[in-house]
Amino acid sequence: MAEIIGVVERIWRYPVKSTGGERLDSVDVDERGLAGDRLYAVRDAAGKLGSGKNTRRFRRMDGLLRLSARLGRRIDGPELFDPLGRPVERPNAFLRAYLQLDDVELAREDAVSHFDQLPVSVLSTATLEWFGEAAPFTVVDERRFRPNILLRTPPGTPPFVEDAWLGRQARGEAPDSARLSFVASSERCSMTGAPQPGLPHAPEILKAIVHAHDGRLDALAEVAAPGRLRVGDRLTLD
């Protein structure tokens, strides 16, 4: 029997990797993920993508989280906004001055995926609200964890309920709803506590996740069947 796990409370898309995103009422979902999500990134001359960490694929570029981006109805290119929310007219020139790096540009995804791990992140309100006890003096907001879907879970749902979804599939009730296949949890890094508009530096957030849940948070999914997701959708597990 299908199990209702919650209601889609918010949908987030991040047109430019590692910058702030945009809230949506609904979104198309294809095999790659949410349409337009992380479709662009700040890329350097070596092909590394701007991020909050240094890895084989990524280059740490402090300050990206203070920026934001949106596509709106467009997929042909993002609008970039500075830390005060003002639109940026010449993104590449702005990024080079803002980051103090002369080899970066805003680039569309090509052969190298812009996703850290898997394309869709789902976070429960039960887990988000747990931080009220785990980090009571910290400003906690889902933007720190950059989910695509914030799912309103029933009262009494335990934190880290996302673990119970792994290995299963979920979809909304509408005939055209996308189907998600939950695979793993995100391994969190210092970006969870990085400052961004309205959210101060908070390193204790990552410490709480490491202590309570081995540094993992959310449920990451692949797209099992394309379709649409909407705020207010009830998601059921198969």
Task: Cite the ranges covered by each PLM segment.
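Metal-cofactor-dependent catalytic cores
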Residues: 1-238
